[in-house]
């Protein structure tokens, strides 16, 4: 059976691994998931990202990041736009997450961007998720 929302599955896997403080997790690869993982790495929410070829679709291995005293860097992840209810934001409506402490992942005509990048480039798009 096919998965109806692979992005929500990826976010749930990250959330679950983070809650039990796993060092790493693996998710089936896709182009959007690779972009999400790269943004999480660039913004400092995860330590590292690896791509593993398995002669099928590939695997993304995500290494989670924890602070001193093993405190979580990712406090929360929330899927916003879902297959049953898409959520779009115009250029001037791109949301801020916790007044800039978190990020919103926005799928735009210029690729997947954070809310800050979307505002800087003055583009809107589909609000995929919030990470804080």
Curated annotation (Swiss-Prot):
GO terms for cellular component: ribonucleoprotein complex; ribosome. One of its GO terms (molecular function) is structural constituent of ribosome. Keywords: Ribonucleoprotein, Ribosomal protein, RNA-binding, rRNA-binding. The keyword Acyltransferase does not apply. The keyword Endoplasmic reticulum does not apply. PROSITE patterns: RIBOSOMAL_S8 (PS00053). InterPro entries: Ribosomal_uS8 (IPR000630), Ribosomal_uS8_CS (IPR047863), Ribosomal_uS8_sf (IPR035987). One of the primary rRNA binding proteins, it binds directly to 16S rRNA central domain where it helps coordinate assembly of the platform of the 30S subunit. Part of the 30S ribosomal subunit. Contacts proteins S5 and S12. This is Small ribosomal subunit protein uS8.
């Amino acid at each position: 059976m096919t998965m109806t929302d692979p992005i929500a599955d990826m976010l749930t896997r990250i959330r679950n691994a983070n809650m039990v403080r796993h060092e790493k997790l693996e998710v089936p690869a896709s182009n959007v998931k690779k972009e999400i993982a790269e943004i999480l790495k660039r913004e400092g929410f995860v330590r590292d990202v690896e791509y593993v070829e398995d002669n099928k679709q590939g695997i993304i291995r995500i290494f989670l990041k924890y602070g001193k005293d093993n405190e979580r860097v990712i406090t929360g992840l929330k899927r916003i736009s879902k297959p049953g209810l898409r959520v779009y934001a115009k250029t001037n409506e791109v949301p801020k997450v916790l007044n800039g402490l978190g990020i919103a992942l926005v799928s735009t005509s210029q690729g997947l961007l954070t809310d800050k990048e979307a505002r800087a480039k003055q583009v809107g798009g589909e609000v995929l998720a919030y990470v804080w």
